[in-house]
């Protein structure tokens, strides 16, 4: 209630999964019931704009358990749902346990296509879903939420009418943002920087922005072009050729003509009304497509 009274109008709650076993494997410290209590407390405090974060393609997760998570959340009728597919990042505890499995899945596509020795190695494990299962989860998410009035406006984000997350849209449209606090990231003009994540250093230099800010980077024109495309293609409306021309003073075809033509021919990119966006097939290989726009 204190947040609400202070003027905070939107909350984001990280459920990730409605399965206690999946939460445990992720190393989450909350339970399904604790999330439910938090959600109800937010409603009781007057919050009418709540996002719930979900995560698919978890170790041991089946299409059925993912559907149960969706049912659980949809029954609560949040205004916004973010549903991301798990990425096993290097340097994390999950990577230590599943890094090799990720690499093998990327190489062979599914467990049935792996050599016998690898099939034996992973037999009985809490395995990561293969590509087909991951795609099925994504499709089920999109169709289920569409039936309930959620519009997908970004690869992994769904919102009720007029409830898009303006915060995230600012990132995808490369608007300036200023991060406050430990480890917070910022983008101001062409300058990108991150605050120190060391509490002692942060307190010692409180008020001295130059010492608090670390990992500074001045983006080149090529960096900005790459980000314009990479981030813009995440949105269902895609990127505007007119906006590209106005921002960079050159046509999108002059810079990316060969890449655009390649993916249009493959049916992974579409062009309509002066905008370029991912096709349905392109969404499933979006990272590979978008990476080709980084100069």
Residue locations for each model-derived region?
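A short, conserved structural fragment
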Residues: 264-274
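Residues at alpha-helix caps and immediate loop-helix transition turns in enzyme cores, especially N-
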Residues: 65-66, 255, 289
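C-terminal scaffold of the Radical SAM
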Residues: 1-250
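Minor-groove-contacting beta-hairpin "wing" of winged helix-turn-helix DNA-binding domains
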Residues: 275-279
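Short, amphipathic alpha-helical interaction segments positioned at domain boundaries
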Residues: 281-295
């Amino acid at each position: 209630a204190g947040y609400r009274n202070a003027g905070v109008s939107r909350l984001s709650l990280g459920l990730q999964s409605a399965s206690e076993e999946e939460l445990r494997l992720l190393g989450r410290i909350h339970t399904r019931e604790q999330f439910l209590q938090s959600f109800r407390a937010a409603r009781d405090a007057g919050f009418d704009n709540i996002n719930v974060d979900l995560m698919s393609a978890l170790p041991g997760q089946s299409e059925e358990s993912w559907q149960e998570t969706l049912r659980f959340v949809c029954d609560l009728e949040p205004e916004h749902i973010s549903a991301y597919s798990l990425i096993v990042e290097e340097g994390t505890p999950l990577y230590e346990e599943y890094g090799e499995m990720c690499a093998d899945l990327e190489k062979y596509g599914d467990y049935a296509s792996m050599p016998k020795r690898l099939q034996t190695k992973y037999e009985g494990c809490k395995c990561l879903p293969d590509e087909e299962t991951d795609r099925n989860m994504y499709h089920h998410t999109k169709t289920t939420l569409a039936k309930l009035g959620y519009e997908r406006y970004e690869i992994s984000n769904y919102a009720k009418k007029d409830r898009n997350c303006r915060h995230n849209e600012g990132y995808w449209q490369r608007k300036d943002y200023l991060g406050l606090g430990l480890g917070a990231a910022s983008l101001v003009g062409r300058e990108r920087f991150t605050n120190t994540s060391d509490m002692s250093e942060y307190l010692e230099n409180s008020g001295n922005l130059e010492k608090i800010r670390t990992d500074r980077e001045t983006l080149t024109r090529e960096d900005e072009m790459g980000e314009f495309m990479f981030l813009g293609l995440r949105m269902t409306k895609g990127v505007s050729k007119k906006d590209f021309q106005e921002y960079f003073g050159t046509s999108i075809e002059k810079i990316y003509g060969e890449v655009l033509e390649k993916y249009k021919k493959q049916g992974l990119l579409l062009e309509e009304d002066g905008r370029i966006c991912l096709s349905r097939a392109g969404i499933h290989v979006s990272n590979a497509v978008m990476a080709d726009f980084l100069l």
